[in-house]
Structure formats: C-alpha cells, structure tokens
Amino acid sequence: MAARGGAERAAGAGDGRRGQRRHLRPGRVLAALRGPAAPGAGGARAALAAALLWATWALLLAAPAAGRPATTPPAPPPEEAASPAPPASPSPPGPDGDDAASPDNSTDVRAALRLAQAAGENSRFFVCPPPSGATVVRLAPARPCPEYGLGRNYTEGIGVIYKENIAPYTFKAIIYYKNVIVTTTWAGSTYAAITNQYTDRVPVGMGEITDLVDKKWRCLSKAEYLRSGRKVVAFDRDDDPWEAPLKPARLSAPGVRGWHTTDDVYTALGSAGLYRTGTSVNCIVEEVEARSVYPYDSFALSTGDIIYMSPFYGLREGAHREHTSYSPERFQQIEGYYKRDMATGRRLKEPVSRNFLRTQHVTVAWDWVPKRKNVCSLAKWREADEMLRDESRGNFRFTARSLSATFVSDSHTFALQNVPLSDCVIEEAEAAVERVYRERYNGTHVLSGSLETYLARGGFVVAFRPMLSNELAKLYLQELARSNGTLEGLFAAAAPKPGPRRARRPRRLRPAPGRGQRARRRRHAGGRVTTVSLAEFAALQFTHDHTRTSEHHVHRLASPWCLLQNKERALWAEAAKLNPSAAASAALDRRAAARMLGDAMAVTYCHELGEGRCSSRTRMRAPGGVCYSRRGSFFGNESEPVEGQLGEDNELLPGRELVEPCTANHKRYFRFGADYVYYENYAYVRRVPLAELEVISTFVDLNLTVLEDREFLPLEVYTRAELADTGLLDYSEIQRRNQLHELRFYDIDRVVKTDGNMAIMRGLANFFQGLGAVGQAVGTVVLGAAGAALSTVSGIASFIANPFGALATGLLVLAGLVAAFLAYRYISRLRSNPMKALYPITTRALKDDPGRNRPGEEEEEFDAAKLEQAREMIKYMSLVSAVERQEHKAKKSNKAARLLATRLTQLALRRRAPPEYQQLPMADVGGA
C-alpha cells in the first residue's frame, strides 16, 4: 500500500509513470487538504502482497480477543529484540514540579502555551482498507454565485438642512392713544356715590403726533373722537386744553415701556342731591411688540389689538400691493422721518421710512422695511459637516452620521425660486458651507460644483455642496489630462468654474418619476414648503440604511466567497489526482482512503484502532543497503501482530514498501499517538511532546463585525419655545400687559379725600366770577366770611370726631339732661305750692309753731279778704325776689342782656298800682 509521505516504495516492474507521479508530490496544496492517503496502483506482486496483508488484518480484527490481555504492545521480531532499547524521553515538567519555581518564567509561559495548543490534537490510530470501488463519488460542479453590484454612486459633501419657518416676524411698534375716563357721581348729604363710569381709547391725530408728541414730547389734554356716531370733545379735569408733558410710566419691566401725561382719574362731586360728571384725559405712548405670521397680511400688537394690514405695506418698491383693510385716508407713510428716542426723549439722527395708521382706538407707527429682505419662509435647522449622498431606486439619500438621520429626496434638484420668500436659503447655506470648509476641509478636500438643493420627504430642504478629496481630484485631473493630451486641458480642468468631473461608472438610466413624485412636485411648484414636527422617520431611515449597509457587507463577502469556491474546485480536482485520500478526507470531513477511477473516485472509510495495540521499531534500516522512509510498526493482537509502517497522522499502513536510499545526517520526526518520536541517522532517539514543537497555523481568522455600533441622537425639529411662539397672539404677554396697565399709568395707592365744603366754596367762587369785577370783590368778602364759618364748623366737627371730644360732649349732654330734669321738678313744685317752693324755711317755721292749735281754743275762721290780700302780697314778694336774684346774677356775670332784662322788670314793678290792702292791727299778727 502506498504511503502518504514524500518518499515512495521500491519501484516494481509494473509501476511505470504512476509511481513516478506519486513520487513527485510537492507537499500540501492547502492546509485544509491534510488527510490519509490512499494506496496507489502498484505492480501485480505488490497488489497480491497487499491483498494478503489486508486479508490477514481483517481476520485478526474479526477474531475474538476475549481472555487475551492486549494491554501491552506486541513484542518485536527476534532480530529486532537484541537491539538496544531507546533512551527514555524526558517528559515536560508539571505545573507543580520543581521547575515551576525557576526564575525563567518565559519558558513556563511558552510551555503552557504549547500544552494548550496541543490539547486539541488527535492521538488515535486509524487503519484504512484499500478502496474497492463499491463507493464511487465525484466532485460537484461549480455553482452560480449571486450577483452583487459594485455599489451606488456615493458623493461626499457638506449639507445644510432647512425646515419650515413657523416663527412669526416680530418688530417694534409705537401706539398713541388717549385714555378718556368719564365718571358720573351723585352727592348726598354726607356721602358721594359713583353711578356710572366708562372708558374710551381715542387715537391721537397724526398731526398731533408729528408736530407735538415726537417733536416736543408733549400732548394735548383734550380728545376729539366719535362716539355713537357723534363727535365728542373731552377735556382733562373739565378744564381748558393745554400741552401736558409726557412722563415715564410708574412701572418699568423688560420689554414694557410707556409714557403718559397724568396718573389721576378725575372725579367731580356736586352739591347734595345733584349729579356731576368728571372727565380725565390721559395721553399714553407705548412701545409694544408686533407679530405677524405667514402670509403676513396682518399683525397683532401685544395689547391684543389686531391690525388688518401687512407690516410691509407701503408706498414704494411695490409695497402698495400688500394687503390692507383700511381706507387710504387712515394711512400715511413719511420718508426721511426722524424718530425720537423713547428713553432719553432726544431725536435720532438716522431718518427712517415711518408708517402711521389710525385705527378705531389707537394710532400705530412702525418702521417700513422691504419684505423679501427681512422674512424667509424657511429656517436653518441643522448643519451636517459630513454628509454622504447615494443613489437608491432612482432617489437620493442624504446620510448625516452626526445626526443619525437619513433624508430621502428625488434625484432632481428642487427649484427654490418656486417657493415664496426663500431667497435667504442660498445665501445663508453658501456662507455656512464656506465656513465649514475653511474650518475642517481646507487642506484635505476641494469643493466640486455649486450648491444644490433637494426637497426631502417630510418637508425638509437639503442644501448640498459636493466635494472631493485631494487625492481623488488629482486622479481625475490626470485622467482629463491624458484624455486631452495637452496641458491646456489640465489647466482647464483645474479651473473652478466647470469643476472637476467625477470618474464614475456609467450612470444607469433613472426611472421616470412616479405618480407620488409628480404630485409632490406639483404641490411644491408654487406653494410654501410644509415641514412635519417630528423627524423620527429620518432616524428610522438611517437605521434601515445602516442595517442594509451591514447586509451589503455580508453580500460583498458572500459573492466573492462563492467565486472563490468555484475557483478552488479546480484545485480540489487536481489535489484529488495527487492525493485522492487526503482530498476525500478533507471533503468528507472523515478519515477515508480513496483512489481515482478515471474521472471518479473510489472511497472507503478508515477504522479506528484501539489504544495499546500499536508499537514501533527503533531502527529504520532495511536489508539490502536501503532504509525505510517511514518508521516501522506492529499493530493488532499480541499473538498475531501485523507488521507495517506508520503513515501520516497516525495512519497504519500494512507492509513495508516505503523505502529510500540511506543518507547521512538523517533526522526525522514522526507522529506517534499523542506525541512525536525523533529519529536520527535512522535510529530512535527520544519521544518529543507536542508542546516542544512550535505551531505554524495556516488558518486565517475572519474577524467580521456585521453590524456596527451606533448611538442615535434625539431629533427635535421644533423646540418647545418655537412651538409656543407660533401664533399671531401671545396671550400670556397680552394678559401680563393688561394687568400691568393700571400699575403703569395710574396711581392705585393714592387716596383722594372728598371735601364737600370745598365743593361749595368752589361753586360760590365760580358764581361770583361770572358777575364780573364787582362780583369778584363781593365774592371775596363773602367767601372770606363763609370760609371762617366753615372753618368753625369744621373745627367743631373735628373736635367731636376726636374720642376725647366725643366723651366730653357726652358728659355735657348728660349734665344738661339732669339740669333739665331738676328745673322741671322745681317748676312743678312752684306751680303746686308757691309758698313752700319760694319760702320753704318760713313755711317750715309756721308748721312747727308751738302756739298753733292750743288745747281749749277754737279755730278761727279764715277771712276771705285777708286771704286774698295775703296771696297778692306773696305774689309781689316772689316777683321782688326774682328781680333781686336776676339783678344779682347780672352784676356777677356782667352781661348786658341780663341787666337790660332786670331794668325792664323794675320799670314794670314801678308802674304797678299800689296794693289795695289794709293794715292789720298788731293783735292780729303776733298776739301782743
């Protein structure tokens, strides 16, 4: 049986060219083709000997081995037993041996690495019977490989992405108006009530603004306006008009500035029981914020007023075609108008075009500016300093790795001229591209072509500027120079105007745009670009493209791999002719023996031999002056060993046909079980462990990252502030402004005290002033006296209003009540018993007289005449007593009125006739 090594057996008579071909095998074609070899075609004698040996080997394997210990290898033949025993091969130190503590740690590491590499080696022995042709195989033909394109057209560049501009156009405006407050009051005896109050906002006339407000920083204190279809004139404080100076508002807040003439609400009070109306006129100038949204046909003020006129309406540069809802008489545009600085009150030096519009309630003034230079329907969203454009299915895909987003558009450029108010895009995008190029690509790339714009899905406009690396640009220039054959062509190609031509493969014909693409073009042909508020679809598209890119990497590997397999099939066919057993073992992934049967291959599988049933010879010299090219071995049972040779990879070959001429300095390593054995000069030297041999691997690792790791960034098309600032009116600003209005232009902390006396005095003064000079003189005297009286009354009222004065007044009232009660009792007693009331002591003495009603005396009867005289006398005496008492009090108090009354009483008594009575005898009086 032929061996698998590099030597051959001794040539027989019938070998021919087949033996020579096997002798010229040049080693291994591929490392994966290692495997057992099949015997070649030998002579008749060799074939017969091989058949006999294989029959013997089959009988030995089939015989039962029970009762025969096979643990020891079979003994060598007698001629080989006298040979010296091979020296014991040193075994490598174990991990716990003495060598582990040696200082040479590198040796231990290398040994451990070799042991780890040798752990996967196969130490089993195989016996391969010769293929008989029962199993015939053939190599599979080449397979068709999947077609994979070379890739799409990729263009590197710088991109600027634009979105719909939803932010309103804001500007400063000045409003002029007069706040007219009319208050109606009714005055009672001790109080006043407001029965009605209304407020009107009156626009300031344009002539008053230009000639008085913006020129002198003053304002008239009267207002003329229409109310209910009637012309009404209102005067501040119901007084003659005058030029009131403007003063800053009481409250200063960011973005809130205003000026006014008064902070008082005039309230007039009339006489008791009458109605009175008072008017206050407050001239107010406010700086407000104005907002206008697309299509800019109106604008709103921060006060809540909406002006139905475009902020770009004017009388020049075609601005008269802008929208307006007011009559021409209400609008006025002044060229070269000098504004006044609201903070300092000084006139500015730069003239402007000033618009004035008088509405129903306010007069609005703002600076006119051209429309196309100040508003843009698109706003810059993001800048992509590294953008890649590629073609896919007739569309362009713009991938920005810095945004983790991919935008898909048509393959045709988008004409921005069809989008209204989009002039800012080209200018702003070119400036951004130039800035990015200077900062990052100035030394490595060159710009190629001009700025291109594309309308991406979702309403995004992509401004893309292609560029080339310097190396690629040089290659293109060299190609153009070779194609032109002159230096002029090179210089012409280097000129920046035409730009370098891209050396790409012929571009495929683009498919005609579909119905959806045509619809999108018609929709954006003359209208505004509308952008979605979410950009997750761009991130999903980027994820899809990222995954497809990884898939394309696999496809690019699969297609060349298939082509490589088809090419290697020819190598397999040739390897099968050189070593069919090795080729069959590698193809079948199993140890097999094979031989070629023309264009087919006969295959038979090898069988594994148990452990301890194989031994080897120590010498490799054969009789006849030749040597064995493979070491000899014995395998099988101990009683009937089979003599053969050790082939490659522990394959046992029956027979000893592999010989070679003996050479000097012979050194060979043969695989034997789990280790190698070393022979020198055809004699056994020692056993070599696998760890002592360095490993040369022919295996190429495939380190393939199928899906690259990416971090996705959140895409926020519109910020929260932009979404909150989209409307025409900012209701929070309007509410804030309305709540601050009273604090800014009126004093809410001042208390106005109403004085009715002053109202009376003012009324009297107005009355006497209407009578002329004489009336004014008389009025001065009367008003002086009335003022003194009012002061007295006010003093008394103030005294009573004081707590101590109220207590004193209460005590006086109580004392007066007690005195009145006592006087009433005195008068009552006087009426009932005058004598007792007038002479209480005399009557008490008469009552207590002991001589009255003596026992034994009779009571005398009263004389009627005497009784009447006594009564007259008592009456006269009472009058005299009263006169004396009154005279005494008058002298004591020195009052003229009382003295006068006393004299009159005395005169009355003197004129009275003498009393008509008779003198009584003394006996009647005292009893003497």
From Swiss-Prot:
Transmembrane intervals: 804-824
PTM text: A proteolytic cleavage by host furin generates two subunits that remain linked by disulfide bonds.
| Keyword Iron on entry | no
Which stretches of sequence are listed as region Involved in fusion and/or binding to host membrane? 185-191, 270-277
Q: Where is this site: Cleavage?
A: R505, P506
Keywords from the UniProt entry = Disulfide bond, Glycoprotein, Host cell membrane, Host endosome, Host Golgi apparatus, Host membrane, Host-virus interaction, Membrane, Signal, Transmembrane, Transmembrane helix, Viral attachment to host cell, Viral envelope protein, Virion, Virus entry into host cell
> What is stated as this protein's family in its record?
Belongs to the herpesviridae glycoprotein B family.
What the entry lists under HAMAP family is as follows:
HSV_GB (MF_04032)
State the protein's purpose.
Envelope glycoprotein that forms spikes at the surface of virion envelope. Essential for the initial attachment to heparan sulfate moieties of the host cell surface proteoglycans. Involved in fusion of viral and cellular membranes leading to virus entry into the host cell. Following initial binding to its host receptors, membrane fusion is mediated by the fusion machinery composed at least of gB and the heterodimer gH/gL. May be involved in the fusion between the virion envelope and the outer nuclear membrane during virion egress.
Name this protein carries in UniProt: Envelope glycoprotein B
Q: Supply the source organism for this entry.
A: Bovine herpesvirus 1.1 (strain P8-2)
Q: Which gene encodes it?
A: gB
